[in-house]
């Protein structure tokens, strides 16, 4: 016989009745990242990052330390987080309520003001203090540093380029036009007044401005009497004055563009003057054009970001020295083993490592071809494979001598690098000419630098050793893995701020969040193993 059991196990409640827990943290899981975050923050003196303003009027200010905790935790959990999203989380997520500790939910503008006014100058010190605690707890090895760089698209309009070479070329055209105009002025107007303007090969803005003022005063021109439009005929003096004024404005524009580019760049964006146009791997427009971007450099130690830097250079070679100098300023020493890919292996960087006691574990340009292409490595027509006679002269595969011709300096080299130029005594009638130098119409010449060749041999020995193989493997995992997490896992592919200072602020916040989350993950793995 079936019994009709109508027992109601639901409690009697109403949805509209207010019922809150006495302690919010009891609802948060014990393995939640917020507890690891609070552990790190409790060991850092946050008050020293903020200067007391001493306001005596107006509403009480929001607690800057709580706001900083909320911002850092948002970057820790999400990688990159908009200010409006942070405000939304503070209203709906009990973990952010726990961090605010009863404070009224701040608006997105409040977070923006704190980042802009307080963190711009102190964010790097905050990053160092976070790393100091994490590195001490996790026993991070700062002697083995894995270096890599990536290009991140700037928050600039895509078609706002300014090319330095175009400005230089067009400025020269303006110089030529000014010379022609001065000839016309001297011939048609100033000659009758007994005055003659001097021509030059290049015209400074101040000189052209002085000419314009002198022309106006000498000819007695009054700009209020200038005519324009249909039915009016301009005088010769007005035409020449307006033409020279136009050239002056163009010279000012070119001078500003060239000065903004500086000596180390060839382009910049009109909407972000610190961004440089570079070729990115992510060509989403499909037209193979350059995009405004920054070169992000990171030094990784035991999976943590130890140092981060931003440079406007498209090449990684020029970024190595500034990154190592920043590492030294931060930690008080240089890493013993800086490991990097072939983009960093230059003569200057190798000598820099020697000067500062660092081992050479950076690949050079032809490293992969040298180690994997046996045909290239054993090619008898390469100069490094040439034999030598008793006098030390190089001998080609046909036994002909290469005679020393001269020593020449390599341009743009900080350490005064030189290379030796050798020329074959005679390539006439050589049976190996087609394989040795098919394009040469004269005797073959080769350029060699014995010091650089010796450095490459040392690098090969270092990288092909067991220790070097482990370092190469770890570099691929740690440095490239870091950018993989940021770009793909966190979907961070374009900057949100403009200007180099603001870009460094944004990337340092992301690095703080990355290290905090990495520390939490390692801590959880150790807990599970235990």
What are these regions (language model features)?
Residues 1-21, 207-210, 214, 384:
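Short, flexible loop/hinge motifs at secondary-structure junctions
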Residues 71, 79-91, 101-530:
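Anion-binding and metal-coordination hotspots
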């Amino acid at each position: 016989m079936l019994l009709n059991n109508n027992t109601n196990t639901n409690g009697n409640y109403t949805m509209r009745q207010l019922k809150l827990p006495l302690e919010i943290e009891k609802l948060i899981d014990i393995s939640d990242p917020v507890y690891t975050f609070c552990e790190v923050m409790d060991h850092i003196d946050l008050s020293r990052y903020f200067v007391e303003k001493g306001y005596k009027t107006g509403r009480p200010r929001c607690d800057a330390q709580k706001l900083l905790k909320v911002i850092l935790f948002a970057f820790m959990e999400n990688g990159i987080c908009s200010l409006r999203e942070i405000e939304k989380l503070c209203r709906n997520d009990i973990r952010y309520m726990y961090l605010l500790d009863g404070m009224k939910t701040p608006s997105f503008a409040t977070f923006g003001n704190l980042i802009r006014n307080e963190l711009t100058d102190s964010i790097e010190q905050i990053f160092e203090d976070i790393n100091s605690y994490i590195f001490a707890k996790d026993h991070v090895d700062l002697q083995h540093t894995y270096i890599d760089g990536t290009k991140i698209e700037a928050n600039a309009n895509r078609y706002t380029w300014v090319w330095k070479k175009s400005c230089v070329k067009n400025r020269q055209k303006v110089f030529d036009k000014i010379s022609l105009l001065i000839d016309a002025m001297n011939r048609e107007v100033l000659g009758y007044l007994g005055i003659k303007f001097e021509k030059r090969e290049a015209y400074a803005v101040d000189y052209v401005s002085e000419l314009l003022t002198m022309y106006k005063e000498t000819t007695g021109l009054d700009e209020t009497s200038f005519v324009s439009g249909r039915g009016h005929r301009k005088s010769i003096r007005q035409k020449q004055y307006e033409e020279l004024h136009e050239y002056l404005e163009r010279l000012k524009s070119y001078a500003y563009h060239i000065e903004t580019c500086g000596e180390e760049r060839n382009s910049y964006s009109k909407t972000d003057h610190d961004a440089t146009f570079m070729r990115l791997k992510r060509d989403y427009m499909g037209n193979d054009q350059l995009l405004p971007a920054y070169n992000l450099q990171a030094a990784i130690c035991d999976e943590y970001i130890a140092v981060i830097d931003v440079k406007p250079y498209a090449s990684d070679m020029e970024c190595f020295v500034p990154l190592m100098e920043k590492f030294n300023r931060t930690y008080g020493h240089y890493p013993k083993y800086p490991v990097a890919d072939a983009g960093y292996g230059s003569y200057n960087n190798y000598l820099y490592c020697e000067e500062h006691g660092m081992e050479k574990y950076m690949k050079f340009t032809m490293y992969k071809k040298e180690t994997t292409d046996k045909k290239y490595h054993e090619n008898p027509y390469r100069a490094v494979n040439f034999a030598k006679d008793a006098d030390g002269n190089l001998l080609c595969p046909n036994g002909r001598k290469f005679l020393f011709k001269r020593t020449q300096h390599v341009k743009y080299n900080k350490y005064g690098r030189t290379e030796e130029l050798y020329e074959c005594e005679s390539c006439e009638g050589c049976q190996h000419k087609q394989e040795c130098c098919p394009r040469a119409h004269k005797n073959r010449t080769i350029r060699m630098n014995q010091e650089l060749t010796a450095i490459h041999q040392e690098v090969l020995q270092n990288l092909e050793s067991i220790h070097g193989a482990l370092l190469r493997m770890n570099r691929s995992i740690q440095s490239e893995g870091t950018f993989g997490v940021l770009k793909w896992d966190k979907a961070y592919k374009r900057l949100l701020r403009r200007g180099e200072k603001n870009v460094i602020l944004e990337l340092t916040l992301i690095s703080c969040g990355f290290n905090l989350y990495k520390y939490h993950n390692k801590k959880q793995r150790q807990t599970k193993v235990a």
